[in-house]
Swiss-Prot record:
The protein, known as: CBP80/20-dependent translation initiation factor
Gene behind this protein: CTIF
Tissue: Widely expressed.
Record-linked Gene3D superfamilies: 1.25.40.180
GO BP term, pick one: regulation of translational initiation
Region called Interaction with NCBP1/CBP80, residue ranges: 1-305
Amino acid sequence: MENSSAASASSEAGSSRSQEIEELERFIDSYVLEYQVQGLLADKTEGDGESERTQSHISQWTADCSEPLDSSCSFSRGRAPPQQNGSKDNSLDMLGTDIWAANTFDSFSGATWDLQPEKLDFTQFHRKVRHTPKQPLPHIDREGCGKGKLEDGDGINLNDIEKVLPAWQGYHPMPHEVEIAHTKKLFRRRRNDRRRQQRPPGGNKPQQHGDHQPGSAKHNRDHQKSYQGGSAPHPSGRPTHHGYSQNRRWHHGNMKHPPGDKGEAGAHRNAKETMTIENPKLEDTAGDTGHSSLEAPRSPDTLAPVASERLPPQQSGGPEVETKRKDSILPERIGERPKITLLQSSKDRLRRRLKEKDEVAVETTTPQQNKMDKLIEILNSMRNNSSDVDTKLTTFMEEAQNSTNSEEMLGEIVRTIYQKAVSDRSFAFTAAKLCDKMALFMVEGTKFRSLLLNMLQKDFTVREELQQQDVERWLGFITFLCEVFGTMRSSTGEPFRVLVCPIYTCLRELLQSQDVKEDAVLCCSMELQSTGRLLEEQLPEMMTELLASARDKMLCPSESMLTRSLLLEVIELHANSWNPLTPPITQYYNRTIQKLTA
């Protein structure tokens, strides 16, 4: 009996010791893992680079937004502030706040620009601390080290909770929990990148319900991550994006096609029909409001009239700013100055700026369907300066609702409005108003707004080809894009923030254009006058960078006097907080522009 009791006592002592040893080993392993993680944190930069290299093909849309983001908002990550003249050496990385990864067609389920733009949050652009989590992380019970610490009766009495807890209910994360969480996220991304790289072509397919493995929790986590700005495999097989290094990928993809390096293809343009403005004739016009209608394109032998009357400055806000001038001026002919060549559409927009009223018939396009006849007739009868434009907009909406019975018909209506808006820049503002009224019109689950934003997104991805093949359509697309941003609003009254970076990209490319310089600068100037205030409210850092480029271009000796005058007016308007300039300053720019285009 004594031997058996001694044996049982020794076995109990051995088991208790082994228990203590196991707990000690778990305790040591947890801290060893912590210090290993600390050592791996130093390799985060290299990990970002490896993750970047794995993304060999990205969408054209996200790649093209790299330069405005890389060069504007570097201090969003707590880095050095940008230089005064807009140095382009800084870069922006919207860590965890990448709206483009959530709104491109490469993201989960083929989401496009119309991913509820009113719900996009821009507040995290300005987070100063890179690794500060949105919410404090709870304390982690490391491998059950706290197990068995409380005996029966030692728990907290909930009735006396106020006596137990301190006055401040918050808690601080442990020293390295933020870094550990970030590193775990980085490990998961690198693991997913390696798996994606090892898959055969065509293997990047979303998991079907029939292929679910027992580990469905991980599959659900991947889906949840894609809704939070992460990524899921795209049906087309293209690699997906992560928010933490999206902008570096944009920059990497954009280095292949510098904006200014268009080659010789830009010299052959189908739609560039230029003519010199000669012998302007003066025509008195009656005062009108809104965007005035424009002439139909004239042949190069036709004389281009220049306006003699301009509206007085209006109050700030809205796309009516660019039509704010009224001044009687006699053009002066300067024989020694070289003649400035503008596109026909640019001359039309300049006449609209100078408020010349030309009521001309609009050519009716041949409808593909009989139901479209009346809609196109109403659409072509709309004039920007007519007093009954709102009535015609309402008539068009009612007719569209009555005749639209399928998704194809709705798509045809959107396509008709879009084609007219990008081909006739004078109609862009009216088209944007019409689109705003019909934004929530839905047929078979498809919204008018979704189809419109998809068309804008498609043209944005091929804008370089548009610039080389059809410069008129390129300028018309940029004009309509800015008008949509300045006019359309979400259901909560907010502008479509998803359009902010595309507009900045297009405006920067207008300033960098080496071919139709005056036309591009004129387009950039007029769009900044109409939407500059709203753009700066959404993303002021990129406006600072854009205006720095405008100053550099204005000081370049090779630029024409018209270019310098237009850019100087924009810079002065920005210095006046986008409020209308005083009448003497407005008259000065009016005379200068009229002399330079005479």
